[in-house]
């Protein structure tokens, strides 16, 4: 399943629909981040806001600043053509580090509440707490610049 998703990212990147940035060293892929410039489904599909749709630092490489660098790189890329960027993040404990990362780097909840499978979850509705249960964050204008500056400072201080 994961291989098919990654192959679809490559095809979409070749067609200009997706941007994929990869962090790697001489031996391995450390992580990656993907951006859809014009989402066709989900929260940002009607807004024109580009969306980070997949962001992974493989567990063995976490805690080394790789996630900060990938987020910085995608923020810089986005700032060349828009002043906004969005991301959805899961609500279960598996996503705890990611939730903190986005808030620490200038992303704020977008105020649309909880979503499940690309749709807002109605009040009192039930949902399965899986990877499809999410909340969306957004960085806008100065927040992207602030995000970049904060990331640069964190990278410098981690050396």
Segments (PLM) and residue ranges:
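Conserved GNAT acetyl-CoA-binding A-motif
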Residues: 78-91
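Conserved catalytic-core motifs of GNAT/GCN5-like acyltransferases
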Residues: 88-90, 106-126
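Short amphipathic alpha-helix that is part of the acyltransferase structural core
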Residues: 1-4, 24, 29, 154-158
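Short hydrophobic/aromatic beta-strand or adjacent loop that forms the aromatic wall/cage
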Residues: 18, 131-137
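Conserved acetyl-CoA binding element of GNAT-fold acetyltransferases
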Residues: 45-59, 87-88
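Conserved acetyl-CoA-binding loop-helix of GNAT-fold acetyltransferases
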Residues: 57, 63-76, 100-104
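Conserved beta-strand in the GNAT
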Residues: 22, 28-39, 51-56
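Active-site rim helix/loop that mediates acceptor-substrate recognition in acyltransferases
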Residues: 1-20, 41
């Amino acid at each position: 399943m994961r291989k098919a998703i990654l192959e679809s990212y490559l095809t979409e990147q070749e067609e200009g629909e997706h941007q994929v940035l990869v962090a790697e060293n001489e031996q391995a892929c450390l992580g990656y981040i993907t951006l859809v410039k014009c989402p066709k489904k989900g929260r940002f599909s009607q807004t024109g806001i580009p969306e980070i749709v997949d962001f992974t630092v493989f567990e063995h490489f976490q805690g080394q600043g790789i996630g900060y660098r990938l987020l910085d790189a995608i923020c810089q890329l986005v700032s060349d053509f828009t002043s906004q960027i969005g991301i959805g993040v899961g609500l279960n404990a598996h996503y705890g580090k990611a939730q903190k990362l986005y808030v620490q780097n200038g992303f704020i909840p977008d105020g649309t509440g909880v979503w499940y499978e690309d749709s807002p979850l109605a009040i009192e509705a039930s949902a399965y707490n899986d990877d499809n249960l999410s909340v969306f964050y957004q960085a806008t204008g100065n927040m992207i610049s602030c995000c970049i500056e904060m990331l640069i400072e964190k990278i410098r201080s981690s050396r």
